[in-house]
Amino acid sequence: MTRVLYIEGSPNKDYSASIEVCNAFLDTYRHAHPDHEIQKLDIWNLAIPEFDEAALAAKYAGLSGKALTPSQATAWQRIEQLAAPFHEADKFLFGVPLWNFSIPYKLKHLIDAISQKDVLFTFDGAGFAGKLAGKKAAVIYARGLGYQSPGSFTPAAEFDLQRPYMETWLRFVGVQDVTGIVVERTLFGANGTVDRSRAIDEARTIARTF
């Protein structure tokens, strides 16, 4: 069965633009693909382990080919369990609000924890290979200001560390088919409402054939 993993990146459950657009995407996707499974991963209700001394020691033991100690093995098992839903899914939907020109720290924590050699990528001395190859992703990017608007005082070329980071990371772990939908000006009343409506329509269109 085809499985979609929805990673919800906003803690604002009542008025989140990224969640609203993601929900529209998922509603349309369910209608178009009633036999597919959708799994939700709310990072704000997810126990993400600290990448602490034991985890770091396990990482370097693995890189050097040394056997793991019991504490290192336990730490590494938690990392592998956290990454398991990404291996089990065929498609990904990310809802990503922009925080301080980048992504929420909880999402960065998750990515930092699971982006490990032999977990999400391999390295043979000649180069890297992502272990999520063949999968596809749609990413909803929500922003309070108009980064793409002409004359913006936060132009995307200088201030957008959100979309480039997500796309670089996804491709690094093997996901080459990446679609982005941007909803901006969420702090601007009527203008923000118009942009939400446009993003929702775009999400529904993409979801039908995703």
UniProtKB/Swiss-Prot annotation:
Its cofactor is FMN. Binds 1 FMN per subunit. Transmembrane segments: none annotated. Keywords: Flavoprotein, FMN, NAD, Oxidoreductase. Its EC number is 1.6.5.-, 1.7.1.17. Homodimer. PANTHER family: FMN-DEPENDENT NADH-AZOREDUCTASE 1 (PTHR43741), FMN-DEPENDENT NADH:QUINONE OXIDOREDUCTASE (PTHR43741:SF4). Belongs to the azoreductase type 1 family. This is FMN-dependent NADH:quinone oxidoreductase 9.
